[in-house]
Amino acid sequence: MTSSKHICMFAAENDVIPGAKVGGIGDVVRDVPRALADDQTRVTVVIPAYGAFHELPDAVSVGTFTTSFRGTPQRVEMYEVSIGRDNNVRYLVLHHPLFAAGGKGQVYCDDDANQPFATDANKFALFSVAALSAITSGNIDSVDVLHLHDWHSALTLALIRFDTAFESLKSLRTVFSIHNLALQGIRPFAQHTSSFQAWFPHLHYDSGVLADPRWPHCINPLACAIRLADKVHTVSPTYASEIVQPNDPLRGFHGGEGLEEDLQQAATQGRLVGIINGIDYPAESAVRLSWQKFTLQLSEELLSLIVRQNTLRTVDYTAHQRVLAEAQRKRPAHIITSVGRLTDQKMALLFQSTRDHRTALECILESISGRGLFLLLGSGDAELEEQCQQVASRYPQLVYINQYSANLANLLFANGDLFLMPSSFEPCGISQMLAMKDGQPCLAHSVGGLRDTINDESDGFLFKADSLNAQAEALVQRVNDVLHLREQKPDTFTRIASAARKKRFEWSTSASRYHTELYS
């Protein structure tokens, strides 16, 4: 690079800041700036303070400015959070009472089904205009590239296009990253307190540029960003090729989620780019523990989580007791692990019925009875949590841990034999990379980033089929085949595990492509 460049990122999450991560976007916003920053590049990352992060011990006030929202001036405070020693990376949080609408420190709100995204849309509409005002007021200086993440910051592109207050920002290069295409932030144009005209009553705009392709009376922030950004970025090449196709529920295929025509146009114009995410690699790999040490650490970590809660939940007690019981036995022949948020995306195939009316999860559990253990770590959707708990009550070979902690996840990554990731769709995925890093091969659905990171029977295992039922059947069959391989050809399985451990998804490689394919 021949000249200095300043990249400014707007996002809803940033895992550098304690408590500011909910999903995978927080990991990416944590890691990408560090990989990008060098002597020629500085990066500024901006998120809302959510009523909490401006109060962190390392947060220092660095400015106050006003922005226009709902037709009135709004005072916004800006704080810099100094965490770690990230040269040429600056972390900012914006404070305004509306950003704490869901409660102090709550990143997202859970609105009623009859008004989806209403509270979050208010919050992120203000965040979008406030973050832009931080630039035009001089509180963030000399920006060259504006990099936006998901629908939460997508409205900034509409404001740059139609609000004369941001006329000076039209020369900025803009990049929009899609981490979750299913969440689009759709709201009415008008006649609601959470609507585009309620937020920006002074604006004269072209509704055709901003409208949802299915509901023309609604604004779709994600569609708007896809149409207006200089580059549209997805977090894997295969996912970029999938989302230009329409969804096909009968085939169990997740594509463009209604925005495929906009994405097709972006692809035709050369604006759609797929770049795989990366992970960090420590100097030394995690050490695989003996069965006694593993179960001891697992039970201790579980107990520490339990004692922090006000009440003892049945699901936690059951998991802890099951781990204690397993500690008294020999190590099972096979330890299957899975780590992730409990969402339809991650769990639908496990609960899909097979031809004998059992779910795929039940079939897998019955196939490992007496010879294996399935350790499932995750929380999320309440109905899915209940389903997992019910299955665990019937199958002692399932240890369902309805929690999340990095320590528990790392224990499972480092000590399992086969990592299961049967996502219905997967923009990139990070859990499979973390398991592979520790030498645990992954068995995954051949979609999106899973297909891009796993080579079947070389460093992991893939399955695919053309309907939901067939996908569930293929998942069960593949698990059985892999466990049979592990029993009958242990040298082959060990070779695959070794290849998984050696595979690398370096952020430096991805960052180089960011510079050449997104920012130039």
Model-identified regions with their sequence ranges:
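Catalytic cores of nucleotide-sugar-dependent glycosyltransferases that transfer UDP/GDP/TDP-activated
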Residues: 1-520
